[in-house]
């Protein structure tokens, strides 16, 4: 399964972004890929082009092009006679996507490039974006600073004017390390501070943290989407087709996907249970991810950032702990 199509909050990761782009007035989305389009990706495009009434196309690399080269490759798809700027998003990023606000920010500052930044408590493990005091103009980038220079980091969402493409050669190029510093040196790069939550969910631990943040956001903005009931604790998202048995305790911070069957006496917290999963009686799953069409046996325990792939069968009373990643096999 291509990572952008992995479920998050009961929809493919990338669908969160495409819906936000649609809401901001975008009419065409270009997916940059570095492999043959698997059938599942083609099916996704066919389904959601129709549902969202938005054009979705591919730009495929034949060799690695870094984070900037794919933009040069897709130039003909990104530039038209209007000269309007275009968004670039990292597919692993989950947030509230304030894209309309970013368009206004870009216009107000007459920026060549605008980047979204988020504020973190410990910036030492990130590349820090340093802005001029009292303004949003980017001065420099400092990779994993040893001393405090700021707490803003790149959030992986950009709005670029077409002229940025003139700076990018069709070769392996880093937009963060090669292109943005040049634009910043010309005082044409601006950083918008992202309101609300943000997480790069590309790793299992961050996925689970991001899910908690996402559910908190739903609680604030659309609480009617969350489950309620005597067996629900905190923020829980349950697909309408899922079946939950008696005596279960679900939550907090749980997502249950379509077609799931949760038998009686099951305990779930801090976890994702994806489409078609069967959790048998009295099993317990915490801080873990259970992939599509898997089965977890009676009294089994799955916890501590364990990831089960597709079609995994966990035997009755088995215990799985701490980062085990298993795909399409019995345990």
Swiss-Prot record:
It catalyses: alpha-D-mannose 1-phosphate + GTP + H(+) = GDP-alpha-D-mannose + diphosphate. Keywords: GTP-binding, Nucleotide-binding, Nucleotidyltransferase, Transferase. InterPro entries: GMPPB_C, GMPPB_N, Mannose-1P_guanyltransferase, NTP_transferase_dom, Nucleotide-diphossugar_trans. Pathway: Nucleotide-sugar biosynthesis; GDP-alpha-D-mannose biosynthesis; GDP-alpha-D-mannose from alpha-D-mannose 1-phosphate (GTP route): step 1/1. Its EC number is 2.7.7.13. GO terms for molecular function: GTP binding; mannose-1-phosphate guanylyltransferase (GTP) activity. It comes from Arabidopsis thaliana (Mouse-ear cress). The keyword Magnesium does not apply. Coiled coil: none annotated. This is Probable mannose-1-phosphate guanylyltransferase 3. Gene3D superfamilies: Hexapeptide repeat proteins (2.160.10.10), Spore Coat Polysaccharide Biosynthesis Protein SpsA, Chain A (3.90.550.10). The keyword Signal does not apply. Diphosphate binds at residue 3. GO terms for biological process: GDP-mannose biosynthetic process. It is an enzyme of class 2 (transferase). GO terms for cellular component: cytoplasm. It comes from the Eukaryota. Signal peptide: none annotated. GDP-alpha-D-mannose binds at residues 66, 90, 92, 127, 154. Catalyzes a reaction of the Smirnoff-Wheeler pathway, the major route to ascorbate biosynthesis in plants. Belongs to the transferase hexapeptide repeat family.
């Amino acid at each position: 399964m291509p990572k952008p199509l992995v479920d998050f909050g009961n929809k493919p990761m990338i669908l969160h972004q495409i819906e936000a782009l649609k809401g901001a007035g975008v009419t065409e989305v270009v997916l940059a890929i570095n492999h043959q389009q698997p059938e599942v990706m083609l099916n996704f495009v066919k389904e959601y082009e129709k549902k969202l009434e938005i054009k979705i196309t591919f730009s495929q690399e034949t060799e690695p092009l870094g984070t900037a080269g794919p933009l040069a490759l897709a130039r003909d798809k990104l530039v038209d006679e209007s000269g309007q700027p275009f968004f670039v998003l990292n597919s692993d990023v989950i947030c509230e996507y304030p894209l309309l606000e970013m368009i206004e920010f870009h216009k107000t500052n007459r920026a060549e490039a605008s980047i979204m930044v988020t504020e973190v408590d410990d910036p030492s493990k990130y590349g820090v974006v340093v802005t001029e005091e009292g303004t949003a103009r980017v001065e420099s980038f400092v990779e994993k600073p040893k001393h405090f220079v700021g707490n803003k980091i790149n959030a992986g969402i950009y709005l670029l004017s077409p002229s940025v493409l003139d700076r990018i050669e069709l070769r392996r190029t880093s937009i963060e390390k090669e292109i943005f510093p040049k634009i910043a040196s010309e005082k044409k790069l601006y950083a918008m501070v992202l309101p609300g939550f943000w997480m790069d969910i590309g790793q299992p631990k961050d996925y689970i943290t991001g899910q908690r943040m996402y559910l908190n956001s739903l609680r604030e903005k659309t609480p009617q989407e969350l489950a309620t009931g005597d067996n629900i604790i905190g923020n829980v998202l349950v697909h309408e087709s899922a079946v939950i048995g008696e005596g279960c305790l679900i939550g907090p911070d749980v997502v249950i996907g379509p077609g799931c069957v949760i038998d009686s006496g099951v305990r779930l917290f801090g976890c994702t249970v994806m489409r078609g999963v069967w959790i048998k009686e009295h099993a317990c799953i915490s801080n873990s991810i259970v992939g599509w069409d898997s089965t977890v046996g009676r009294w089994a325990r799955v916890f501590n950032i364990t990831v089960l792939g597709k079609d995994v069968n966990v035997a009755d009373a088995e215990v799985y702990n701490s980062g085990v990643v298993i795909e399409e096999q019995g345990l």
